[in-house]
Amino acid sequence: MGKIIGIDLGTTNSCVAVLDGDKPRVIENAEGERTTASVIAYTDGETLVGQPAKRQAVTNPTNTLFAIKRLIGRRFEDEEVQRDIEIMPYKIVKADNGDAWVEAKGQKMAAPQVSAEVLKKMKKTAEDFLGEEVTGAVITVPAYFNDAQRQATKDAGRIAGLEVKRIINEPTAAALAYGLDKKGGDRTIAVYDLGGGTFDISIIEIDEVEGEKTFEVLATNGDTHLGGEDFDNRLINYLVDEFKKEQGIDLKNDPLAMQRVKEAAEKAKIELSSTSQTDVNLPYVTADATGPKHMNIKVTRAKLESLVEDLVQRSLEPLKVALADADLSVNDITDVILVGGQTRMPMVQAKVAEFFGKEARRDVNPDEAVAMGAAVQGGVLAGEVKDVLLLDVTPLSLGIETMGGVMTKLVEKNTTIPTKANQVFSTAEDNQSAVTIHVLQGERKQAMYNKSLGQFNLEGIQPAPRGMPQIEVTFDLDADGILHVSAKDKQTGKEQKITIQASGGLSDDEIEKMVQEAEANKEADKKFEELATARNQADQMIHGTRKQMEEAGDALPAEEKEKIETAISELEEARKGEDKEAIDAKVQALMTAAQKLMEIAQQQAQAQQAQGADAGAQSKDDDVVDAEFEEVKDDKK
């Protein structure tokens, strides 16, 4: 069996490693660098990858693609993709299937297709070093990548001519690299991985029994749209805003200038990790009728920290959730490991140390640890490493939609993979001949708030009263974290299977909502209380509106009366149901319908007040001096 290489396919940089003897070794690329920029450029008849692509970016911004990992497995409509469209110099377009694709040199390409160019370079780098063809690889992904994003990463490998032997989570890979040669018994480590575009936290237990090491992931959490690129964008926006204040020119409309500012911002950010201030100096950045314009802006470390403080803070929330899911406190953590280039920022290191109450380990290379761990896993799969067992987990719960729009979970989040789970369901109506299996990923009880991974039909069910047929649904989650689903009619033996295909990524907001609201969904009492409150509000609204209608009498036009009566009867109908959202919507609809009634009630109240007012008030107006006034509109409301 040939060598299985380990590849860290990063947002900003990628790295390849291989097992050399019993130790992982990072391989230098053709340019002599240990990491390769994840930048791809399309020029006339040539595709450039890495440093050569980065070097020509200033003169070819619209055909130079970077941070493609932020788009992999995502839908065009995703909020994060829409945000990226505004800041990326290249074109992000909507594919026929709704995915986010890119366009360069007039050609539309899928994200896995572009990422495959980076993987091809990694493959070639390894082949040049080993002197033989390489076909097998272990590729890493952020722990919080969903099914679609994992599938898309596997597709990229296949396009690059690689057989992807395993997809493993980046923090887990880093733990493998770190713990492989560590002696001294059991330890519980926290891997804080802040890369170019994604953030993960994993709590991992390393057990050693008679020389065999088990790496067990206890919990994982993260944010698939938070990373160094976001830090860069904050600094880019600051520089552009400062330049606009000084020169009155908006550089955002100039792709060439923006590419120069991007490079300068990235360089300044790196410099500010080791110095307290730096100058961003870009001569001839643009020009207008008065001549050329130069950018010269001083940036201090304190300024940069103030620009990104909320991003660092955002990374701390998943730490709390991961510890709670692992049922541990900060005192139970033996070692803290920092992975990803953005963790070189002193502020990030300080905040993480403050959170865990201990300094992070300094003996881990944040740019290389993930690829080295992937190479170790490659060695395990190739049979070169015998004494290592890796137990990873699924980051989000998996289930299907059942009657009433409820998500029934078959696999809970943080379940060790591979895993298999099955459950028997039945029909919702008499003589139902087919069922639709709607597969979901997420933590919400209501199906509509989770990520839809796909659906399929099981047909040919024999006619029977509802609840009688037995349909067994099986979820098979493989070691790559990719889901295979089957549904079987136990009476007829008819079966339908699918492997969930990439249909788009999870948005940050969706993930955030899933985590935050997961706890709330466990509390049936809370749900009941909310429903009761909604019903009470509906009752009050109906009673109050009817009372106002009586008082308004003939002042309310007949068509308005009819509109309100319709809204009241719709609210009364919704009130009988169990759907709080439906009740709230109908309350809102009644408020809208009763707007005219509110105006009449207000006019009647004002008329009554006017009757009782002092008739002599008019004479006082003679002494009043007219004043000019200006209406101030508050746009923030």
From Swiss-Prot:
Modification type Phosphothreonine: residues: T198
Region feature (Disordered): 600-637
Record field: compositional bias (Acidic residues): 623-637
Matches recorded under Gene3D superfamilies: 1.20.1270.10, 3.30.420.40, Actin, Chain A, domain 4, Substrate Binding Domain Of DNAk, Chain A, domain 1
Induction statement: By stress conditions e.g. heat shock.
Cited Pfam families: HSP70
Annotated keywords: ATP-binding, Chaperone, Nucleotide-binding, Phosphoprotein, Stress response
MF terms in GO: ATP binding; ATP-dependent protein folding chaperone; unfolded protein binding
Keyword Phosphoprotein found: yes
PANTHER family the UniProt entry points to: HEAT SHOCK PROTEIN 70KDA
Family, as annotated: Belongs to the heat shock protein 70 family.
Role summary: Acts as a chaperone.
Protein name, per record: Chaperone protein DnaK
Protein's organism: Vibrio parahaemolyticus serotype O3:K6 (strain RIMD 2210633)
